[in-house]
């Protein structure tokens, strides 16, 4: 069974998923970061593929992408790194990438290689939903990859229900229609959006991302979702500490 499915079926508490950019701060940090996150009880990990034009990302993740590219990170290297730790990772791994690097690699080749190294899901923020359904869903299904779709405050109820009925795994609730980034708190408008989606009683569990950075934002998000995704905050700590173990410990301390 897919590890994402197993995680949500067996969960005893809210899910915490962490995002980081592969190849940042250093090219070979990927393995250590994943190991440290798993050791410290993180439920799921999103590994970002660096891209030169990351339109959905704020300054922190953009900067990490540029640095990772300078370090030499690409999909081929990432797959080699993940292959090396495949047998030691029990939690779900998700690859987050813009469409261009995947097309360059070959979409089916990408999915096949993800399957070989036990990747559970993929997120492609610039892949239109209709294009996914018409051109790519049969491929991801063939390799047991959960396609994680994003929704935002601007996504209509009709579209949310359409997404919910056509995907499995979980739905990624973006806390704002802007780019990723760190927020100290969620205003009433964002909280109303969380409550609105919660009241829709969707089939899929939902994780809230974009802006989770401290105990306050974590608590508010968990009131209206099955878990959270933390990205910019962790990437900024990786940049600050330049030490994966210290960055993980500092993140967990700030969320308590």
UniProtKB/Swiss-Prot annotation:
It comes from the Bacteria. Its EC number is 4.2.1.20. The gene is trpA. InterPro entries: Aldolase_TIM, RibuloseP-bd_barrel, Trp_synthase_alpha_AS, Trp_synthase_suA. One of its GO terms (cellular component) is cytosol. Tetramer of two alpha and two beta chains. This is Tryptophan synthase alpha chain. It comes from Azobacteroides pseudotrichonymphae genomovar. CFP2. CDD domains: Tryptophan_synthase_alpha.
């Amino acid at each position: 069974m897919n590890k994402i499915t197993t995680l949500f079926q067996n969960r005893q508490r809210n899910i915490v998923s962490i995002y980081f950019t592969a190849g940042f701060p250093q090219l070979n940090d990927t393995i250590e970061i994943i190991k440290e996150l798993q050791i410290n009880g993180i439920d799921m990990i999103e590994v970002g593929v660096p891209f030169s034009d990351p339109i959905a990302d704020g300054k922190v993740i953009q900067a990490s992408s540029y640095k990772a590219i300078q370090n030499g990170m690409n999909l081929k290297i990432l797959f080699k790194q993940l292959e090396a730790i495949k047998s030691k990772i029990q939690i779900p791994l998700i690859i987050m990438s813009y469409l261009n690097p995947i097309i360059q690699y070959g979409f089916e080749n990408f999915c096949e290689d993800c399957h070989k190294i036990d990747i559970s899901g993929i997120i492609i923020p610039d892949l239109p939903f209709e294009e996914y359904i018409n051109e790519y869903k049969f491929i991801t299904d063939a390799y047991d990859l959960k396609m994680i779709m994003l929704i935002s405050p601007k996504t209509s109820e009709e579209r949310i229900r359409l997404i919910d009925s056509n995907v499995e795994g979980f739905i990624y609730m973006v806390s704002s229609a802007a780019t990723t980034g760190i927020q100290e708190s969620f205003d009433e408008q964002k909280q109303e959006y969380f409550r609105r989606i919660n009241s829709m009683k969707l089939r899929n569990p939902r994780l809230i991302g974009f802006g989770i950075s401290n105990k306050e934002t974590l608590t508010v998000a968990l009131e209206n979702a099955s878990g959270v995704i933390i990205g910019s905050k962790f990437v900024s700590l990786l940049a600050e500490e330049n030490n994966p173990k210290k960055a993980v410990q500092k993140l967990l301390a700030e969320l308590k």
